């Protein structure tokens, strides 16, 4: 146990100190990729939602000791940022062509080729989940599995298109104002997490608000417009045969779209985890809710944690907290069943 705790401490220290950043030149511009871990291990790539990068989308999950022991023990992590979303990014030149979702998916292929990666595990949130799903449809042989959080899969409705067209125009004229920060935070977090006049917003929301203030409006606008021009993936999803694990908060604005995606996927290869009292970013708001489903999902690929960090009754990894449905043979890769879960929110 001492050896395991030391290994987890080293992994968390590596995450806190930052990975190695690479700037990959693609046909559609340069892409920032931050790499954590041993590049000899299987690859797990991540892609964030609009206006975010890996620190504001995945830090909550990757700073959980149990998640570190599961993920960095089995994978080398490649955090891909949409163009202009990386830390210290310069404003995008107005003359540069605006990318489409197809262009962004093609960039992922170029990133994989740059690092000489074959088939990879993919993890994405909302718009990032859409980009990775599109990539999986176009390049099935390059995807081992998908972990999608509050994913998009349909073309935007007229009301959604109009809403984000207004947001895009506000970004163009005013940059990331206080009003726009509130709009994006509603996209990411539950009402409980955002607080009220009587209850302060949670620390994770406060930190996300701060990070939003560092984004360049022109870069956000380009990614937002690409997502606002997305097409329906429903038909393509029906042909996907890679194992897919989907998380969604029951207060996510994209809850119904996530349920639609689940119906489009082959039930033999997909599972849904609905997290109660949570918004879209389960990775930040309730990261512990992801641990047990991911652990059993990875077992289907022959991947395991080196040992349990804690066997106390309060630990989210203790056997008493494991859903009986996850112990079925189907959950080990033969067939994954929809479940619902709620676990403690603090790491």
From Swiss-Prot:
It comes from the Eukaryota. It is found in: Cytoplasm. Keywords: Cytoplasm, Growth regulation. It holds the Pfam family Ndr. Involved in a signaling pathway that modulates root auxin transport and auxin gradients. Acts partially by positively regulating the auxin carrier PIN2 and AUX1. Acts, together with GB1 as positive regulator of meristem initiation and branching. GB1 and NDL3 positively regulate basipetal inflorescence auxin transport and modulate MAX2 expression in shoots, which regulates organ and lateral meristem formation by the establishment and maintenance of auxin gradients. Belongs to the NDRG family. This is Protein NDL3. It comes from Arabidopsis thaliana. The lineage of its organism: Eukaryota, Viridiplantae, Streptophyta, Embryophyta, Tracheophyta.
